[in-house]
Amino acid sequence: MHFVSIDLASKMAWIKSRATLGEIYHGTSQVTSEYGFPIGVGPTVGSGGHFKGGEYGLLSRKYGTSFDNVLDVHHVDAQGRLLDRASMREDVFWALRGGGAGTWGIIVAQKIQLVSVTPRVTAFCLSKIGKGAISELLYRWQAIAPKAPPELFSTVYVAGFTKGNVTDIQASFYRQYLGTTVETLALMGKIYPELELSAMDCKEGKWIEAVAFIADV
């Protein structure tokens, strides 16, 4: 993993822009199960554009966006100079934190802050069918989501389908919780019983295993 260099002593890593998100996940998991990073789950997505767009990940509710956790960059400007945070203006570094891929120059590497993850992490995907049921679940979640603990990541994918002469919609609810299955069931039973989550729907393991489950790899 020559595109990802981890320093556990400082809880930091240097990521070359050529690295994919999958390589970041893999490189980190080979060194530690105690730390992760708030990035997306597309394993083939390039980290350079991902970081420069700001981007949101499974740990973002607790730790912020990807670039909220970038501490330094190696950046080539319009004059061909290779700059780091110390040698560029601070407003340029600020602009690089989510200002858009390629807008301010070329980022060749970024120094990131690793963030703590729990020893056990639970993920689940639960599908529901039916316009009425899904409408009620989504309406309910709008009231719950802002108050949910930051350890809980959630997203839902809604798509239409046709089976025979019947056209309907299906919603897939994806969640990741920094905790055990028992803790996840207790939380969801308290704040979102309408989802009817059961232990059979959950997969508990290390953080990287939860990421792989949600990414479906």
Model-assigned labels for residue ranges:
Residues 1-95, 104, 133-151:
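FAD-binding glycine-rich core of flavoenzymes that anchor FAD
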Residues 73-217:
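C-terminal cap/substrate-recognition region of VAO/PCMH-type FAD-linked oxidoreductases
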